[in-house]
Amino acid sequence: MTSQLAKKAEAWSARFNEPVSDLVKRYTASVFFDKRLALFDIQGSLAHAAMLAKQGIIAEADRAAIEQGMAQIRQEIEAGTFEWKLDLEDVHLNIEARLTAMAGDAGKRLHTGRSRNDQVATDIRLWLRSEIDNIVGLLKALRGALLDLAEQHTNTIVPGFTHLQVAQPVVFGHHLLAYVEMFTRDTERMLDARRRVNRLPLGAAALAGTSYPIDREFVAQQLGFEGVCRNSLDAVSDRDFAIEFCAAAALIMTHVSRFSEELVLWMSPRVGFIDIADRFCTGSSIMPQKKNPDVPELARGKTGRVNGHLIGLLTLMKGQPLAYNKDNQEDKEPLFDTVDTVVDTLRIFADMVPGITVKADAMRAAALQGYATATDLADYLVKRGLPFRDAHEAVAHAVRACDDLRCDLADLSVAQLRDICGLGDKANLIGDDVHTVLTLEGSVASRNHIGGTAPEQVKQAIAFARAALAE
């Protein structure tokens, strides 16, 4: 029996009387997707080995042999020559088997005081911390690109919409700054999530800790963690840090999706506000005239995919008792795909934004439609003593009359406005200066406060956002 069991590949096989079926091996193996954690697995193992040697749990010679073997394994992985084996289940046992083949008993001693449960939790946190740093950098690049475009359009007037109906005129730079604000909060969320990712689970072992005299704080310091997970059961079993990351990622993609929707609308010939550079568009196999905004369209679609991963991870965790369960193997593919999707999307959008051509004349022409300055006329009357609700009603009468006359408010004479607004003996509240508030420039200039669309405020907001970006 001993000789038969010795032939089994699994590190845990001595407990069993028959080998695992090939179907189960394929069903339970994770090596073909968790191998992307390999370099972080090595990083964690080196810190663990250093701690074991420091604490006298293994000999210094064993630590040196482990370090030498891991250096060779790293080279093989980076060169693409490392042989990944399905029989060895996952990234951890593949690396351990290769290490043992090179370092002998020293390799077998590496797993002392450790379980794959706390090992994989450590690997994921190391990997995710690195990816968060990358995503934060990409968010900053996108914010910078939007600020550059906004700075070019602090006086370009575009209609602002509610319910996709023309509402009030704004400057295009102000519109773009709304997305800068969104992506700034996304950056803050990522950095906040990083704090909870940046805790060391290693040392929790399978679930209850270990009887060896380990030094978890030393390992945390070696790996750059801010501290250790304070409860061994929690350390190996929960993936809330990954779920929190995916929630923040879903919000990033939601903001990208909203921006994408507007890009698609703006590029439509029916709107014609912008053009997107050819390198970000595709054509049609049948319609030779087509230039399709595939990148923003696909970003909208990929947002649903990322949202689905978030729901999948929440569902994965909701029914698990403490501590670790095999269910958690299913955390990696949605997490990996979320990171890949967000990274690719942010990278391409940061490159695409500078190539947007703004058609300012079309924006202005659209802003002159739909009575965009109606609120300005109401405010004009309020400032002359009319209660706002009465002013609102008076301007509504004027808008209805313009519908019948097929003209804009600015096309009406002072006499027509006095007659149409139905103000009776208060008609003289409409003075000869009324048309100054009915111009697009007058409208945007009047919103001269923090957060408003006045060009000077937009310039100040851009400066503020650039300072925040530099922090």
Swiss-Prot record:
The keyword Translocase does not apply. Belongs to the lyase 1 family. Argininosuccinate lyase subfamily. It is an enzyme of class 4 (lyase). GO terms for biological process: arginine biosynthetic process via ornithine; L-arginine biosynthetic process. GO terms for molecular function: argininosuccinate lyase activity. One of its GO terms (cellular component) is cytosol. Pathway: Amino-acid biosynthesis; L-arginine biosynthesis; L-arginine from L-ornithine and carbamoyl phosphate: step 3/3. Keywords: Amino-acid biosynthesis, Arginine biosynthesis, Cytoplasm, Lyase. It holds the Pfam family Lyase_1. This is Argininosuccinate lyase. It catalyses: 2-(N(omega)-L-arginino)succinate = fumarate + L-arginine. It is found in: Cytoplasm.
